A protein has these predicted regions:
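Divalent-metal coordination cores built from histidine and acidic residues
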Residues: 1-49
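Conserved, mostly hydrophobic/aromatic
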Residues: 14, 69, 99, 209, ...
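Active-site core of metal-dependent hydrolases
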Residues: 45-169
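Generic structural "secondary-structure junction" signal
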Residues: 20-21, 34, 108, 167, ...
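Generic structural marker for isolated residues within well-ordered, non-membrane alpha-helices
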Residues: 40, 146, 206
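Aromatic/hydrophobic pocket-lining residues that form the small-molecule binding cavity
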Residues: 36, 40, 62, 202
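His/Asp/Glu-enriched, well-ordered alpha-helical/loop segment
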Residues: 116-134, 150-162, 168-220
Length: 220
């Protein structure tokens, strides 16, 4: 992948398909499954360009997958997950040190019948060594929560991500796939049941963090 100096691609990031069916978001529900060593081991062996893989750590086999990926120099990252504190801690112990699209398609504080239950978000905040990635377009994650991420995780623990689609920087008349629409500065499923990705470019993220979330330009 890096043989041509004019195409210095650092690696591939896989998002799916070992995800929580309850947190599918815009992922295809029928493709979601538990980790299968017979499937993922040949992929890692045959494609050393894979450098990061998004996984829900609560799935059966996810801890074994995280340990395997870490041994191969691949970063297992938490995403599309219903994990609670114990799941996140166990994941962290086997190599899940990063969170993809923090707050999006993951559990937060919720009720389980009459009891309260922490979610992935609160659990990640409690682990100092876990870094997060946020889609900082001001829509995927509201401004007050962007402020909270920066306040708790800081500049060293936070990465900005566009999650940009091929229609990034386009207008509402640009996207032709009938499954999606562009509306109010973001891509959505056509039935508006979930966000489907961003149309933001990195400069928009920087402006959002500086002008609305109060982060210094240097830190942003």
């Amino acid at each position: 992948m890096n043989e041509d100096p004019n195409t210095p691609i650092l690696g591939l990031h896989l998002e799916g398909h070992y995800l929580s069916p309850k947190k599918a978001g815009a992922q295809l529900p029928d493709a979601i499954k538990n980790p299968d060593p017979a499937e993922y081991k040949p992929l890692i062996e045959d494609f050393p360009c894979i450098k990061r893989w998004d996984i829900a750590p609560e799935l059966d086999g996810a801890l074994e997958l995280g340990e395997y990926l870490t041994s191969k120099g691949v970063l297992p990252s938490i995403a599309h997950t219903s994990a609670v504190y114990d799941d996140v801690v166990k994941g962290y112990e086997v190599g899940y040190r990063h969170v993809t699209h923090f707050y999006n398609a993951m559990s937060g504080f919720h009720n389980v019948r009459e009891y309260k239950q922490e979610g992935t978000v609160e659990s990640v905040y409690l682990i100092d060594g876990m870094t997060v990635e946020v889609i900082a377009d001001g829509i995927h994650v509201p401004i007050p929560l962007l402020k909270l991420v920066y306040k708790i995780k800081g500049v060293e623990g936070t990465a900005l991500c566009t999650d940009g689609l091929s229609c990034s920087a386009g207008d509402e008349n640009m996207y032709l796939d009938p499954r999606f629409i562009i509306e109010n500065g973001v891509c959505k499923l056509a039935d508006r049941s979930a966000l489907a990705g961003s149309v933001a470019t990195m400069d928009r993220l920087i402006r959002t963090m500086v002008n609305e979330a109060g982060v210094t330009l240097f830190d942003a």
